[in-house]
Amino acid sequence: MTRTRKLGLVMLAAGLCFGPPAALAQTQIYDARTKKWVNYDKKKARQYYARNNQLPEAFRRQVVPFRTAEKPGTIIIDGNQHFLYLVQPGGQAIRYGIGVGREGFGWAGIVRVGRTAEWPTWTPPPEMVARDANAAKWAAGMPGGPDNPLGARALYLYEGDQDTIYRIHGTVEPWTIGLDVSSGCIRLNNDDVTDLHSRVEVGAKVIVLMQGAALYKGV
């Protein structure tokens, strides 16, 4: 079975289908001042956040219509569009803006929430320690707190009983929501991840959709 075919099955499992592949397209937002769609990169993201002290409207938490065959409580992540959906009853979902894996670090698959934590400890994986001098300083673990890269909350993603090393977590860089910036984890701003953490149960199904990304080995 080809990778493309497998990803199609993942999307069918979610009971929904997104538009054409967007993995190579730059994120865009609507600029109400100029009434134009503009590219949203790291520079513009920092400028917008510094000016407004909040995310662009598209990436703010909101309830939206959402059709899916998945039951309420399921998390569906659209990595290409930078949205996380928490399925709600009545054909709705809570939509959160997210940051996702940068080029070469995106992934797709079906996993579950294995455990959760408040103000989690950050322990960088060996691969990150090897390539990142800053991460190497915390090889034994960085205690939770306002400077911790995992932010205020973390949902740990498992395949069966195995930790995937991927997380849904907060961030100390809220302006990065809407961008491809991480090493594979899904990041939300701290207010949003705190809200999500309060609603999600351990064992919840998590479907990660990202066209053009590598599939997690369990799919």
Each PLM stretch: what is its role?
Residues 2-219:
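N-terminal pre-domains immediately preceding structured catalytic cores
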